[in-house]
């Protein structure tokens, strides 16, 4: 049995433990060239990861402390993070000792298995959006300035439309100049309804409350709420986000169904600081990683899940509205291991 088969069976067994017939299951297969997009989006991460591991394995004739130190350096360079890296390397060491392996070329499967099983651990990797049938589902997007939040919302909206859901947008970013116009432009391109502020400098919480109410009255399946980019150090803006979350719950205690933090993948471990600060204000349900094609640090997914147990919901790359993928661990594994010389193809 190949490593792919073993890992995928573990993943599928975990997924099968969680099934809710009330949830809307999204299908990434509605998109064309999904596998190609994953390859493109994670190319830098794949190249760095595979090339680094191959060099370590082929340049070391024995398994010693230096060998494990080089693996540790590779994981840290991928933004896996100190804690996760130490745990993963320790697990690799223990397995190598247990199997009494002394040939570096024989531990490739162990390295990969421990890396990705660590991501799964004993938890269920719930990457599907928590959307309920016959309800107006509210998804709140937030993050710091410049992460590509508004474009991400357009990408998610397009993806949901491809899943035959009735989607609308709420322009809650009343602070940034041109933000409402930018979202409105996307709405027109995608032929999606949008709720905009009714007066200049309107309180964003009131815009979102009115927008969610309007979406519910018009029987939309999903309403995507844009918010102003905010630095986690600005107390007043963070309190504003808390207020926005509260007014949504005032309309419906079960909403928002998803509160998604949008993070720029190129900032590496700084994303952990952002996640920590935002999680103190709003209960984050998942992460959207943008600009994943511009970095070799795809290992940040391990650090985020390790520190906050937050699932990755979407990967974004490029400027096109189609440049988005639901996070799929099976696809992620295949791309991360592409061209790893010993692996047999399924």
Question: Residue ranges of each PLM-predicted region?
Answer:
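P-loop/Walker A NTP-binding module and the surrounding RecA-like catalytic core of P-loop NTPases
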Residues: 116, 125-346
